């Protein structure tokens, strides 16, 4: 699945496409900039091979400027998408790229039979919580000491209209 290019920074087109193994080093570099506890190249490779059914990158000027990844969860009662990771290079934020990536992965989850999407976000990451709220996500509960450093994680969900 590829989203047609749309104007990004300074009107340069941004292309959203499925990622491939060759993207891992560049994704890992961006991930290290964005997160306190990045998965790293090996963790990304393992996740892509074993769990992340949906992984997309945003590309501008031949460079990966953002990515998102997730997989499908099936409890037996409900099938939902799990948005595991999303990051945008700082200079490309506030331009709609994150929203486009989330819309792309949500569409993929829907095609795979999901009725909702779940994600976790650090309780201190107010910008991310506000971003997901704008996209229709709602906080449903909190994991105590969810992250390696002991920070709590807010679980947010969005249900697709039936």
Predicted regions and their residues:
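Short, Lys/Arg-rich nucleic-acid/phosphate-binding segment
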Residues: 75, 143-144
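C-terminal "cap" of GNAT-fold acetyltransferases
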Residues: 2-6, 115, 122-126, 135, ...
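Short secondary-structure boundary/hinge segments and terminal tails
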Residues: 48, 110, 127, 149-150
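Acetyl-CoA-dependent GNAT
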Residues: 2-3, 9-10, 18-91, 102-104, ...
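Residues that form or flank phosphate/diphosphate-binding pockets in enzymes
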Residues: 39, 78, 96, 127, ...
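Short beta-alpha junctions and helix-cap segments that line functional grooves
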Residues: 44, 142-143
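Conserved glycine-rich acetyl-CoA-binding loop
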Residues: 85, 89-103, 110-112, 116, ...
């Amino acid at each position: 699945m590829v989203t047609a290019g749309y104007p990004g920074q300074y009107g340069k087109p941004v292309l959203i496409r499925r990622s491939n193994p060759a993207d891992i080093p560049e994704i890992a570099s961006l991930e290290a900039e964005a997160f306190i506890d990045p998965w790293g190249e090996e963790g990304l490779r393992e996740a892509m091979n074993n769990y992340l059914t949906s992984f997309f990158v945003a590309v501008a000027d031949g460079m990966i400027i953002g990515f998102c990844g997730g997989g499908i969860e099936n409890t037996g009662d409900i099938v939902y998408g799990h948005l595991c990771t999303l990051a945008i290079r700082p200079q490309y934020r506030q331009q709609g790229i994150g929203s486009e990536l989330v819309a792309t992965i949500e569409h993929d989850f829907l095609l795979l039979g999901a009725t909702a999407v779940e994600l976790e976000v650090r309780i201190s990451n107010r910008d991310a919580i506000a971003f997901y709220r704008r996209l229709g996500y709602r906080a449903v509960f909190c994991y105590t000491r969810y992250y390696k450093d002991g920070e709590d994680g807010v679980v947010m969900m969005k249900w697709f209209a039936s």
